[in-house]
Amino acid sequence: MALNLDRGVCAAAFACAAAVTAVSPAVAQEKLKPVVLRFAADFSPPPHPAAMALQYFAERLPQVIPGSQARIYYAGALYTIPEAFEAMRQGNLEMSWMQMGKAAPVEPRMMAVVGPGVLTTVGAVDSLEKTKTYQELVARLATNQHIKVFGAAHMSFGMGVGGSKRYLKPEDFTGRKVRSMGPVENASLSSWKASPVVMAFGEVPSALQSGVIDGLMTSIGGWLAVREQAPYYTTGGAGAFTGDYYMVAASERWWNRLPKPTQAVLEKLVQETIQKEKELNWCVDKMTYEKYGTKDPSKPGVYWMTPQEVQQLVAAVGDASQRYVKSKLPPDATGLVDQFAKEGRALDKANPPGSSWVEKIDCSKYAGQIVIK
């Protein structure tokens, strides 16, 4: 379940590089319509890996479609994720990089793939798009919500909890106000007797400063943005504290108005960007742990839990997350939760730790780009 940070994870990933689909010069030479698009996200600016990927997208867009511009809005500066979801559905927002679970207030079925203990290896997470559950959700978004999903991207494999104190055992959460990322995480935090507070990341720094929250559930990349206010960060690897995933999406009402050649180039650029994000995500996790990792939980920094410590937290949650999700879904959709759990177990078995191309990425190529402060 752990990130295997102490192993030789920096082997050259030629298969990964080959998987990146470059924008075809032949297509790019066709008559393309310049686009000016807004890209909404609910995570902090660089060095957050997804933010660096969006920065890459913004730089590449005018290169492949001359005259185009991407306006990036971080940390809910333009819309929260539910607001972005609604805006895309109505054709009032072009694109969004969103956390699936945060779309639940608008499309409850998105919660079916969210929660701890389902996809618990790097390879399993990278195989999310192969699941029937994910594919059914993508089809539903297109049919019912008029939202086009390009694909899934990775959230940190070091999702965890940060604060001015260490959150390690269930009793560490008792009575504490902890920022939750969405409704499914509320069930986990409540099981640990914490008081979950749902808020966009842009509100977190001031909430920590004022005492509105005592800690926050976030990614390693998110923690870097509040490290001075929340110097203790605890993680247990993929699926320990939570399981949630990014999806990159666009408004179909906007997308369908674009000429086919423009769509083709944009599609390839988005896939290129998702691939870039997966590499950056892994390397930010790895390089952050190398700089701030600690094996002593009494000291500040990133503490990687032992399997026994992870099990203690997971056992306290039990099936609370699944029960919560089912309680919020219509009766004909509750089967999605069990279906995804079954698919997750199969993917974990098929993708043991250390077997994924992600774990073999050569992070040295990003040494000049990723600056961990």
Short names for language-model regions:
Residues 11-22:
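Bacterial N-terminal signal peptides
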Residues 123-139:
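A gly/proline- and charged-residue-enriched helix-loop-helix capping module
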Residues 6-8, 17, 96:
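Low-complexity, intrinsically disordered/propeptide-like segments
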Residues 29-124, 142-373:
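N-terminal secretory/targeting leader peptides
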Residues 22-28:
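Sec/Tat signal peptide C-region and signal peptidase I cleavage site
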Residues 21, 136, 274-277:
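A short hydrophobic/aromatic micro-motif that marks alpha-helical segments and, especially, helix-coil
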Residues 1-13:
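Bacterial N-terminal signal peptides that target proteins for export
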